[in-house]
Design a protein with these regions (language model features):
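Hydrophobic, aromatic-enriched interface-forming segments
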Residues: 106-201
């Protein structure tokens, strides 16, 4: 389904309809109009009606959640658009911010803070001026069209989010095919790291998806670190997983084949590429 226009409500703007519009814009580079919909708009399959209209009918391009009963699972307009695009489950798995956003939009800050186990004030301490400015500017316009700065930024956001969700699934499958779990011996019984061999062509971020893959793996509690190709050289990067303090890469900082070790010990870069040498460095870094 393609749309000739995206329509959302006027007045104050919230993250859910803003991001929902961004996603729709990524696949439908059309004008965004902010006004109340008419019955004709709701019936027109060429118009995406977002977060307004009291109707969830994806077959007609209508994505509102306000008509759902109060005990409905937290579901916002962003949830509905992600479902329409067929990527909701992956987005819930890969975007840690999505479920809190659903809660905040449908339950408000008090219930969301309680669900997260934090004080209400903590939520607002995490607010970003980027969010505030984009939402405030979006709330001020009646129509956005191609070429306008905010329209272009919204399309970028939508494209990046779509690309992240779609390519991460492919990346995780690839890691599962070629990655290896290494068991590194130590006096106290040893530890496990995830190793990614060098690939050609090398990914833009060779460590992308590694932590997410580990966290979805049954052995995640045993994995202390990651080894992955270094884009800046022929060697490898070594890093902690979940900031495991027992890997301290300052312990290998003086090794001839280690050209960088962060002062806080959580990451290092080495020119070594032989698996046995990499294992030696990891064992030496273990506290």
């Amino acid at each position: 389904m393609t749309f000739s226009q995206i329509l959302t409500h006027p007045g104050s703007s919230h993250k859910d309809e803003f991001l929902a519009c961004c996603l729709l814009l990524a696949e439908n580079p059309v004008a965004i109009v902010r006004r109340e919909p008419t019955l004709e708009d709701l019936a027109d399959v060429s118009i995406a009606v977002v977060d307004v209209g009291h109707e969830h009918a994806p077959e007609r391009g209508n994505f509102d959640h306000h008509q759902f009963p109060k005990d409905h699972p937290p579901t916002c307009s962003l949830s509905l658009v992600l479902q329409h695009l067929g990527i909701y489950e992956d987005a819930r798995a890969f975007c840690d911010w999505l479920e809190p956003a659903e809660w905040f939009d449908t339950r408000g800050p008090v219930d969301t803070a309680s669900w997260l186990g934090v004080e209400r004030e903590t939520l607002f301490k995490l607010n970003s001026p980027i969010d505030t400015t984009l939402l405030r500017r979006f709330a001020k316009v009646a129509k956005l069209e191609s070429g306008e700065p905010l329209w272009e930024v919204m399309r970028w956001i939508g494209e990046d989010l779509l690309n992240y969700v779609k390519t991460l699934r492919t990346r995780l499958n690839y890691i599962g095919d070629v990655g290896e779990f290494w068991r590194i011996s130590s006096p106290d019984g040893g530890f496990t790291v995830l190793y990614m061999p060098r690939e050609e062509p090398l990914a833009d971020d060779s460590s992308a998806g590694l932590a997410r893959f580990i966290d979805s793996h049954p052995t995640m509690t045993a994995v202390a670190g990651m080894v992955y190709p270094d884009r800046r050289g022929s060697g490898f990067g070594l890093s902690r997983h979940n900031d495991n303090p027992r890997l301290d890469f300052t312990r290998i900082a003086e090794c001839e084949d280690v050209h960088f070790a962060h002062a806080r010990g959580f990451v290092a870069k080495t020119s070594a590429s032989d698996p046995e040498r990499l294992k030696e460095l990891l064992a030496q870094a273990w506290v």
